[in-house]
Amino acid sequence: ALQIRVEQIVNDHQHRLKGNRIFNAAALVADVRTGEVLTYVGNTDRDKDESHGNDVDIITAPRSTGSILKPFLYAAMLDEGKILPKTLVPDIPTIINGFSPKNFSKDYDGAVSADKALIRSLNVPAVHMLRNYRYEKFHSLLKGMGMTSLVFPPDHYGLSLILGGAEGTLWDIAGMYASMGRTSLNYFEHPGKNRYDRNDLHALKYIVDQATSKGTDATPELENTSWLSASAIYQTLNVLTEVYRPGEESGWKHFDGAKKIAWKTGTSFGFRDGWAVGVTPSYVVAVWVGNASGEGRPGLTGTDAAAPLMFDIFSQLEGGAWFQMPRMEMEQITVCSLSGQRNTSICDQVDTVWVSRRGMESFPCSYHKIIHTTADRKYRVHSECQEIDKVANTSWFVLPPTQEHFFRTKNQTYRPLPPYRKDCDVSSPLLSMDLVYPKPGSRIFIPRELDGKSGRAVCELVHRNPNVTVHWHLDGTYLGSTKKNHHLDINPDEGRHVLIMVDEDGNTLEEHFEVLSRL
């Protein structure tokens, strides 16, 4: 009966999407504890007049994963203590070896907490996180979790692995989410030091034998670790229950019902694939919407096209209790309220949070600095221009210039560093400016214009003082000055170059870059 109901729901949704020339959809429902497939809808019904690849089994067809793998990276980094749930991650214009990720919204927050980056499915922070974690390790983790479609070595995918640079199947993805849930559930079935059974990580099954579904007398070989720990999984699934999704993942308040669901969407480049996967302690529901032909369509996103179908399927399933918190491998610690990192003695606002045990080893707050100011905190000073007994040692939350530039536009309470008092000569200030493009040490291509003429690179700089004048020099030649919007066209030859920027206060920034060729 469930199979018939889900088939009808899938066909009804596709019928509504047909007006946008979206002709295919697929859905899976499986039991989390056993992996048994309860419903399998490989495609929508064929139209009477024409076929749109309706005979293709989409569930086993490799498709670009979009953002659907981001929860596994978040969990892995929690597991290793590389981040805490609310650790700030950069969200700024980024180019890494020619790879330039963009957020769905096309804008930047400057810095955003890791959990909010996952909830909002921000691409730029995800790339920074993967760079920190290393894509080679993530490639290995995904294979360990059951992703069979990674047929190329890690370098083939690089950092794009987190943004849909690899293909996955709905079958594998559903199995991986189910394995997360199963690991969390079975953690409590094995009291003692060793609580993990590697056999909990397995693909979905069409048929589950009675011994598997009801348990067996055979004692599993237990270990004290797994690809992902129960604590990291628990924290990740809780983050994925967030209902309000700004930006790409918006408008789901009306699904805030009695059922608690951890869910994630994904959208591939070119709007070719819409994914939605949800997991509870009882069920995993995985949905794909798109065209079997690979044709992209406007509005073909995981949020708009796939998630409504997933929630309609969940409406046919029973609810239940949520996953238990694995307190045995978690610690309660204090963190800086602003950076999300372990607090130091100069963090003036702290929160108490539960973290994975290795979170105790994570970096302490790197954003709070002690600066020397006047008593009213309006100006920075130092010992050569202010008597020591009149200098106030002040704790200040300081973002790097590029992050600050974007962060300030969305966080009105952010306090930029106070300027130095005019009588204070600045000899070694905190970094005042930062080059957004080209990045230090980067290697860039400069394309030719459509008319064949030599193209130009547009340099971009941000400064803490919005009204300052900056003077630009390339390889010792003065190029000109900028004020407020620090963008400057340059036309360098192929080879290595030195770019020097000097502001009106004498602060200097020197960066090296290389032009590889003119395309």
Model-derived segments and their meaning:
Residues 53-59, 109-112, 119-126, 155-162, ...:
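Flexible glycine/proline-enriched surface loops and loop-helix/loop-strand junctions
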